[in-house]
Each structure stands twice: as structure tokens, then as C-alpha cells.
């Protein structure tokens, strides 16, 4: 760990702002440059900072030398682009950093480039290549014996599993990441908060809103003192999703609107589109499909401009649902078909199953019961495999009512029983 990284981690773990660390004798801009290894402090300055951070001076003196300036700049750029979900540009930044790594470069610099490449590949849905980079990163972290780096590998693995919609694997990876970062000394409070956000998001997707809220409120306690707009935007977004699933709609809407404001302030268009999509979903769920569709269309325009196929697929599924609710079956069919096409292209079984469920409802409305039954059966199989108890309960109920119309009371009864079991599983897990 370089001197700048060590000072930054110690400061954040103690909840100290750059201004407070600067005190009356140093400037806030000096602390910022120091944390990015852009200035070399005097021994006396190091002694002052060590005292304010409660660290032995020797711990600052034995820090690793920083990587070359060009490599550091590219790593910082890549990480900033990852936070904005600009994965192609992030990939290019990390590839340039990799080309600039000199023989004998610090292992931590090699680690950060390797993990950055893995995360960019994850965002681009190149999962096999991403896994290879994460495996290399894990080996480097273990060679360095650094629990904070082991936590970053586990967190990246969790994001990969989330992207693949393997929710149990994501939960396990984020749990490992949390244990690892808490064993580091000092603990990076910002990164711990981000792991808690992602663990909360995973619980929310698993249909476990109570556990999600516990993680997210714990994240709030870590992040609010740090005033990091990006992290706070993600926190409020995921709180909004979790409260929406608890049917606390007004609380959810307030969090989602706050997230949208924070993302817009950062000009983070990808996450702004995600927040608007979630606000649209909330309005549709509250019986306002036309108003919700307006927000969904705004989200769609941004997703198209960013070439975000996953965002397009997710938004199209929700637009199809809104169209179905207002009785525009032609539009609903077009939107659901395109969502399915994109989800299959992305190899995203969860999104494909969600769109298939909407298509099944369209077929049901049109009286094409056999096709509707086949689509419900496919969606149910996918959600069972993904351990998505809430979705299993919902699809089982819808499928059961369809079978009642077809006169298949026995099969319908089994599906209703499956819906009750899935609901009980979700409640028990909370």
C-alpha cells in the first residue's frame, strides 16, 4: 500500500474529513494530493499526520513507493469510469495502465490493474474473461497477504455473480468481502459501506427486504459521515428499492428521488437512468401506468444513448408491463419480445424470465392459453433455479389461475401450494 493510500484508508476508517486532517497548518488540497501520491511530505509533516491519525510514524515510513504517474492516472481514471458504468472506456484505461506497467512494478499496482480489468469485463458481460482476471487478482492479494485486497477481489466476484444473476453466489461473495475488510487494520469505512450496499441489494433481489434494509441501514451509518455523493446515491437508490418491496411506497419514492438528484449532480447518466427506471416501476406498481411509462421512456433514452443493452432490456420489460395495464397489447408484445431478445443476447436468465412472464400475461389476455402456459412454465423453471422465492410465488399464482381457466384444477392446486411454500420460504428467510 502506498503512502497516499495508507493515509486515505486510515482517515476514512476513522471518519475524519480531509479538512480536519489538514488542521490549521496544512491545506485541504495538500491532503488530497498527498492521498493520490502527488506530493512528497517532509518527515515533520508525516509525524504530524501520524499523530492526528493515531498511527505509529513507522507505519507511514514503510509504505510502498507509488507506481509511475502514468499508471496511477490511468488506474484512477478506470476506477472513476467504473463508478459511472462506462465500462468500455474503463477497459481502455486499464489496458493502457497495463501497457505502462514496468518490469518490477509494485504488486499492488499490478493487482489494481488486474481487478480493474476484471470489473470492466464484468460490466461488458464478458464473464469468462472477467473470471480469469479475478482469479489472477485473488492470487496477487493472497501473495501480498492483504485482507483489504482480498476483500476487493471478493467484492468484484460478488458483482460478477450479480451480473450473472447467481444471487446465492453473490450473497456468499459479499459476505466474504465484508468479513475480509473488517479484519483489515485500519478498516476502510467507505469500502465497507459499499460492500454492505451490494449485500443489501442482493438480499433485496432474493426477495428478503428485511435483511436488505438491515445491511443498507448499516451502510448508511458508515457512509453518511464521509459525504461521498456517489456512495450516498447508491445507498438511497437501494434503500428505495428495498422499501418499495416492503410496500412503504412514499418512503421508497423519497429515497429514489434523492438518488436521482445525487446521480444527476455527478452527471452519472447510467445510474440516473437506473433511478428513473425504478421510479417508473414504483408508479406502475401504484396503479399509475401512464405516469410510470413517462419515466421509463426517459430511462430508455439514456440507456440507448449509452448502448446499455441490459438497461434497455430491463426498461423494455417494465414498459411492456405498463402497456399491458393500459390495454395496449401490440405495444406490450413488441416491448416484451425485444426485452427477451436482448436478455438472451446478454445470457441473463433473470431478465429473460421476467420478460417471459410479461409475454405469458399478454398471451393469456389474448386467449392463447397454451402459449401462455409454456411461457409461465419456462419463467417458473428459471426463477426456481435462481432461488428467487418472491418471483416463484408470483409466477406460480399467475400460472395457477391460468390453469384454472383451462380446467386443470389439480395442477392449479399444486401451483398455488408452491406459491404458498415460496412465500413461506421468503418470510422464514427474513
Where are these regions (language model features)?
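DNA major-groove recognition helix of helix-turn-helix/homeodomain DNA-binding modules
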Residues: 42-59
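Short alpha-helical DNA-recognition segment
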Residues: 12-34, 95
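TPR/Sel1-like alpha-solenoid repeat signature
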Residues: 74, 81, 93, 110-121, ...
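Amphipathic alpha-helical segments of tetratricopeptide repeats
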Residues: 95-102, 135-145, 175-186, 217-228, ...
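Short basic helix-loop element that most often maps to the first helix and adjoining turn
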Residues: 1, 5-22, 80-84
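C-terminal non-catalytic interaction modules
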Residues: 1, 8, 12, 36, ...
Amino acid at each position: 500500500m502506498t503512502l497516499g493510500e495508507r493515509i486515505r484508508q486510515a482517515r476514512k476508517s476513522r471518519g475524519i474529513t480531509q479538512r480536519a486532517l489538514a488542521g490549521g497548518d496544512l491545506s485541504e488540497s495538500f491532503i488530497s494530493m498527498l492521498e493520490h501520491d502527488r506530493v512528497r511530505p517532509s518527515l515533520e509533516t508525516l509525524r504530524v499526520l501520524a499523530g492526528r491519525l493515531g498511527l505509529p510514524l513507522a507505519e507511514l515510513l514503510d509504505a510502498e513507493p507509488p507506481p509511475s504517474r502514468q499508471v496511477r492516472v490511468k488506474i484512477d481514471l478506470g476506477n472513476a469510469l467504473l463508478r459511472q458504468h462506462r465500462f468500455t472506456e474503463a477497459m481502455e484505461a486499464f489496458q493502457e495502465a497495463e501497457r505502462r506497467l514496468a518490469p518490477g512494478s509494485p504488486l499492488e499496482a499490478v493487482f489494481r490493474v488486474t481487478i480493474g480489468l476484471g470489473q470492466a469485463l464484468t460490466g461488458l458481460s464478458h464473464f469468462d474473461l472477467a473470471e480469469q482476471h479475478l482469479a489472477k487478482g485473488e492470487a496477487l492479494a493472497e501473495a501480498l497477504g492483504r485482507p483489504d485486497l482480498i476483500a476487493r477481489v471478493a467484492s468484484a466476484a460478488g458483482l460478477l455473480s450479480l451480473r450473472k444473476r447467481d444471487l446465492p453466489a453473490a450473497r456468499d461473495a459479499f459476505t466474504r468481502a465484508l468479513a475480509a475488510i473488517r479484519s483489515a487494520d485500519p478498516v476502510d469505512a467507505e469500502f465497507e459501506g459499499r460492500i454492505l450496499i451490494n449485500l443489501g441489494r442482493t438480499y433485496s433481489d432474493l426477495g428478503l427486504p428485511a435483511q436488505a434494509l438491515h445491511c443498507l441501514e448499516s451502510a448508511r451509518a458508515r457512509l453518511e459521515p464521509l459525504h461521498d455523493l456517489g456512495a450516498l446515491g447508491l445507498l438511497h437508490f437501494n434503500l428505495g428499492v428495498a422499501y418499495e418491496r416492503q410496500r412503504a411506497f412514499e418512503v421508497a419514492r423519497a429515497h429514489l428521488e434523492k438518488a436521482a438528484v445525487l446521480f444527476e449532480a455527478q452527471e452519472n447518466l447510467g445510474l440516473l437512468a437506473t433511478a428513473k427506471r425504478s421510479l417508473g416501476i414504483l408508479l406502475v406498481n401504484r396503479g399509475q401506468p401512464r405516469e410510470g411509462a413517462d419515466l421509463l421512456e426517459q430511462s430508455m433514452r439514456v440507456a440507448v444513448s449509452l448502448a446499455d443493452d441490459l438497461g434497455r432490456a430491463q426498461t423494455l420489460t417494465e414498459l411492456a408491463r405498463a402497456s399491458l395495464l393500459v390495454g395496449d397489447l401490440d405495444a406490450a408484445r413488441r416491448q416484451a419480445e425485444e426485452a427477451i431478445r436482448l436478455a438472451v443476447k446478454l445470457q441473463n436468465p433473470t431478465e429473460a424470465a421476467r420478460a417471459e412472464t410479461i409475454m405469458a400475461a399478454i398471451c393469456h389476455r389474448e386467449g392463447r392459453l397454451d402459449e401462455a402456459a409454456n411461457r409461465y412454465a419456462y419463467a417458473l423453471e428459471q426463477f426456481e433455479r435462481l432461488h428467487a422465492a418472491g418471483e416463484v410465488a408470483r409466477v406460480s399464482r399467475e400460472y395457477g389461475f391460468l390453469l384454472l381457466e383451462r380446467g386443470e384444477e389439480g395442477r392449479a392446486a399444486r401451483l398455488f401450494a408452491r406459491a404458498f411454500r415460496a412465500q413461506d420460504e421468503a418470510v422464514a428467510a427474513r
